[in-house]
């Protein structure tokens, strides 16, 4: 299986021939190598509603007639205010089967809203992490989150092949907490740091994360690079 990193928290993969993207922050992101005008996707998974994750979901969903998977509140917002036709609302603890595999949403400690041009934020449900099971592999995208001990419970229930974990600090875990989460709680086969160096407030050296992780393998990916397993 091949999973591609495209800056911030954007991940692309294919499962059973279907094209899936997570948190498509493309336009306005000079760390992303994708073109939202030409990208083809069948499914879009959203961890939460902040602009650097919500990103280009409306453009991608409407142009591709893609199905958007995320919190029930977020899906209601997309269908009511942006005319997105294909939405699948879920919540923490829920699992659903799709033709690329299964998606289960798990807890994340963060917030979730979208701020309109007038400065008014819209509540978009709970932030969530994602467990994807596809082609016999298990992927844990933690979403934006702080450290919490139930990461161990999540990994006990779903032994993780690849974990995408934020290291940027300020808004999410930094290197110290992220490496602790990997070493003590999640213990994946492969760890990939995300959500760093997109903005000055989240500048980090991923090599420090790699040095701190003592479990499995750490792969530091540049935008456009992939992990295969």
From Swiss-Prot:
Keyword Hydrolase in the entry? The reply is yes
- Mind listing the UniProt keywords for this protein, alphabetically? Hydrolase
Family annotation (Pfam families): Lactamase_B_2
Q: State which residue ranges cross the membrane.
A: none
| InterPro entries in UniProt | Metallo-B-lactamas, RibonucZ/Hydroxyglut_hydro, UPF0173, UPF0173_UPF0282_UlaG_hydrolase
NCBIfam families reported in the protein's UniProt record: PRK00685.1 (NF001911)
Q: Of which family is this protein a member?
A: Belongs to the UPF0173 family.
Q: What is this protein called?
A: UPF0173 metal-dependent hydrolase SERP1270
